[in-house]
Amino acid sequence: MKKIFTIIGISFLSVSSLQAQTPVEQGNFIIDVYAGIPNWANSILYNNVEPDATQTDVRNYKLNGGLLSYGGRFEYMIADNFGVGVDVNYEVSGFNYDYTTQEYNDVTMQFENRDYNIDYKSKKLRAMARLNYHFVQNDRLDAYAGFAGGYKNVNRSIATNDTNYDDGSINGALIPVSFRIAVGTRIYFTNNIGGMIELGAGGGALLQFGLSAKF
């Protein structure tokens, strides 16, 4: 009987020790690689064609960049519950379509149909410093709340064979600052590799998901 209680006691201590382990602790490095959805510009602004009033027979409309954004995050645990790091993400949005317009021919003195193509791209890069507070931790789960702030750059370009438009590009964001508030969870499949999901406002997509590694 004494041996049975001894075995039960050792088992209880072992389980308690396992549950007390945390997936991250002071001194750990954490790397996240993620995709984000939605790409707000493509989902809302460019999802439906809005051609110029002079453009008729719009066709072959497609989005540039798709509906996802992509990014990476690096974090260093300065304490068991606090981490500091950098969050960088990138997205491309825009549209491409063919259209027909009527132009006056000075030789024939008649209006004639002309076919053109227009291609618009907006490339957005954000680089933000970040602070995370890890409020739930066990042997496999790491839940956190985060705040990030930093720099945003936007590059816009228009390419067309329509002589009534000028090809060109515009560099710089109207407000070159980006902020993000988020809550997220990492679930570790092994001691070092897991998956992550984050819900946030500003500074990227509403929902981010991907892989996480800690060292």
Locations of the language-model features?
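Short sequence motifs at beta-strands and strand-loop junctions characteristic
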Residues: 60-68, 119-126, 171-178, 189, ...
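Cleavable N-terminal export/targeting peptides
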Residues: 1-28
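Extracellular loop and loop/strand-boundary signature of outer-membrane beta-barrel proteins
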Residues: 55-60, 112-119, 166-171, 194-196
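Solvent-exposed loop/turn segments connecting transmembrane beta-strands
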Residues: 139, 196-210
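Glycine-rich phosphate-binding "P-loop"
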Residues: 148-179
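Solvent-exposed, glycine/polar-rich loop segments of beta-barrel outer-membrane systems
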Residues: 45-57, 105-110, 160-170
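Short glycine/proline- and aromatic-enriched beta-strand/turn motifs that initiate or cap beta-hairpins
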Residues: 20-76, 144, 206, 210-214
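Gram-negative (and chloroplast) outer-membrane scaffold detector with strong preference
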Residues: 30, 35-39, 68-160, 187-189, ...
